[in-house]
Amino acid sequence: MRAMKASCPGSCGELFQCVVDGEEFLMSYGIEKKSQVVIGPQTGAIEEVLRPKMLQVINELTDQIDFGYTFHTDISVGKGYSSSTADMLSILGAYSAYKHGTVSVPLLTSLCSKIEPSDSVGFSDWTVMNPLNGAIQWQTRWKPKLYVYILEPDQMVDTTSFIRMTESPLYPAEQSKTLLTDFKIACDKQNVELLGAVATRSALLNNKRLPKPYLNDIIDLVNELGLLGVNIAHSGSIVGILLTEEQLMHMTELEERLSHHPLASYYSLRNLSKILYDGLQVKNVEEILE
């Protein structure tokens, strides 16, 4: 039996997150960090340790680990990179392909949501979904060529411990519901400026629930340089500065300004990523696991 490899990208938080009629929605985008799982026949070798949520979610499909596997990821945990969703989708995708020869991203995403609130990183099209049950609200085939400069603090947080938007008295849910409409308009018009405005507004609204240090300073700098906007991990600690390909020419000045600001010591890890549209990818592995 041929081994199967599945990979799923992480995300720099969410492009936006909102509440509409008491229901929570979000849209995540892929970045150049991923989780990867290979599943094949058992070999008797000592296997790597799977993360607890990967074991929890695979139990939704099988009650026995009767296969060999390897697991690798370069996604940091406890920051808002969608690491758990990427991990869970990778093992579910590899297992589904290995055992059943078919993979349904909507189904697997809904299984992830049973374990914890999840992100839409498994979809190759931008997908707005309910993180609590994985239900799809809206999708677009528009794939703008964008980049994100990720600002990451050293601090780790329990991204599942925060009060949900629908339950937080600090979150302006009524104001947030227009984010979904405005996101759809931006996509239908294929207007990246509107897209950036949606992301920035979502970040500011969420700042009342989970404040990000220096967020207003970051937004001011982005506006000064004429960049696209700012997005955040709404239940995490990372911040993303969104750029078009043409705006990459401002990267040197952007980093220069950031490095001389007090925020540089807090967001000490900073790196540029292309925004990807890979979603969950599954393929055959030529060699059987040894």
Placement of each model-derived feature along the sequence:
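ATP-binding N-lobe of GHMP and related small-molecule kinases
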Residues: 1-79, 278, 290
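Short, flexible, solvent-exposed loop/turn segments with mixed acidic/basic and small polar residues
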Residues: 36-38, 227-233
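Small/polar glycine-rich anion-binding or flexible loop at a beta-alpha turn
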Residues: 216, 233-240
